[in-house]
C-alpha cells in the first residue's frame, strides 16, 4: 500500500494507538520546578526534563535536579535530565541611557572597539564579535535582538566599524543577541561559562547535553573533551541553529549521539520559509542512521498564556511526528506558562493522533533500502526482528540491552508497537527517553549472574507489557536477546505468546 492509499484510509472515527511512540522534552522553570509540579508533568507525559543554562545559577539548577529525581522516585519512573548549554553568543554592549529607539532609515555605526562597550548611543554601539567587519560585507545583514531589528550594512568604515541602515522601528536595550545570517562565524563551541556548566553537569550525573550552536563536527568533539572521562557516557545532542550547522549536518550527526532541530535561532539565521525544508532533511538523515532527533521551539507557544493551542500549532507538532522526529520539545510553555500540565497533555494527544497517519511499513522499507550491505550482524538481527513484528502483528517487542544500543537499532526500523527494553543500568533507562517507542524497565543484576537471569528479565518485560496493557494474554511479543555462548551481538529472536 502506498502512502497515498494509506492516507485515503485514515478516519477520525477510528480509535487511536494505545501507546505514544514520540517522547516529550519539557523545559523546567518557575512554573514547574517544585516536586508536585514535576510529578504532574510526568503524569501528563514528560519523558525528559530540560534545564536551560542560559538562565539561572548552579544552585537553582541543583534544586531542579533534586526535585526531578525526587518526583520520579515517588512515581517509580526513570526521567531523563538534560543540560542545555548557553553556547557561544554574539551580543551588543551596554547603552549610555539603558536603551535607544531606532526608526526606519536611521544610520548607525556598529563597532568592535571596546571603548564603546558600555557607552552605546543611537549613533554608535558595540558588538562583542572581534571578526565582525571581516564576516559581514557591505550589502549583508545584521539581525539584532534575535532578529526583531534588522540592519543592512552600507559600508566598512574601518577595521572595527560598519556603517548600517536601520530597516525597522525598534527600541533596543542592553546585551541583546546578534545574528549574522549567511556569514561564517568563528566562535569556540565551549565558552568558559559552558565549561563550568558542563563540569557541574558531570558532577550531578545529568544524562544528556543539549549542545547549543553546533556548527561543525569538531565542535561536538570539543564538547566531548570538556565532559572528560567522568562524563564519557553522557549523550551529546547537537543543536542545529544556523546555516553552518545545516551545511555540515552529515558530519555533525556522525559525531553526535543525537540532533535537535532548534528552529528559533535557525529561523533567524536562514529564511523562515526554509526552516521546514531543513527540518525535514535533518530528521530524515537522523532516521536513516538511527540517531534520535528532537524538534524544538514555538511548538505550542500560544499555550504559554492560553488554555488551547492554535490550529497551526497542532499541525506543526503533528508535522514533526510525520517527518519522523523521535521527540518534540516544549520551552516557555512549561518553564513559565500558565498551563504546563495541559500543554503536555495536548502535545501527547497530538502525537498519538499523528501516529495513525504514519505508514510504518513504508518507513521500514525506506530505511532498510538505504542501508549499506553488508550490515553489521547486530543490526541485521534487529531489523529482521522488526520485520517479524510487522508480519505477525506483534503487540510489543522486548529487548534485553544493557547499553541501549539494541533498543535504538530496533527503534531505527520504526516498529508500530512499543519496544520494552529491560536493562541493568539506570542511566540507560533515562537516556532511552529520547528514542522513539522505547519504554525502559530496570532489572537489578546484582541478584544473579547475567547468564542465569536472562529468563527472569524476559519474564519481567512480559509482565510489564501486560501490566501496562501494551499486550494481553494470547498476544504475540517479539523478544530479542543475546545467546551468551556466542559473544558480540544479540543473536536470538523469539516469538512468544503472552501467557
From Swiss-Prot:
Residues holding substrate: 50, 264-265, 297
Disulfide cross-links: none
Ligand binding (Mg(2+))? 241, 265
Q: Give a yes or no for keyword ATP-binding in this entry.
A: yes
What InterPro entries does the record tag this protein with? Pyr_Knase, Pyrv/PenolPyrv_kinase-like_dom, Pyrv_kinase-like_dom_sf, Pyrv_Knase-like_insert_dom_sf, Pyrv_Knase_AS, Pyrv_Knase_brl, Pyrv_Knase_C, Pyrv_Knase_C_sf
Q: Which PROSITE patterns match?
A: PYRUVATE_KINASE
Q: What is its EC number?
A: 2.7.1.40
Q: Where does K(+) bind?
A: 52, 54, 84-85
Segments crossing the lipid bilayer: none
Q: Name one GO molecular function term.
A: potassium ion binding
Q: Which reaction does it catalyse?
A: pyruvate + ATP = phosphoenolpyruvate + ADP + H(+)
EC supergroup of this enzyme: transferase
**One Pfam match:** PK
| Matches recorded under NCBIfam families | PRK05826.1 (NF004491), PRK06354.1 (NF004978), pyruv_kin (TIGR01064)
Among PANTHER family, the record links this protein to: PYRUVATE KINASE
Q: State the oligomer form and interacting partners.
A: Homotetramer.
Q: Can you name this protein?
A: Pyruvate kinase 1
Name its species: Trypanosoma brucei brucei
Gene field:
PYK1
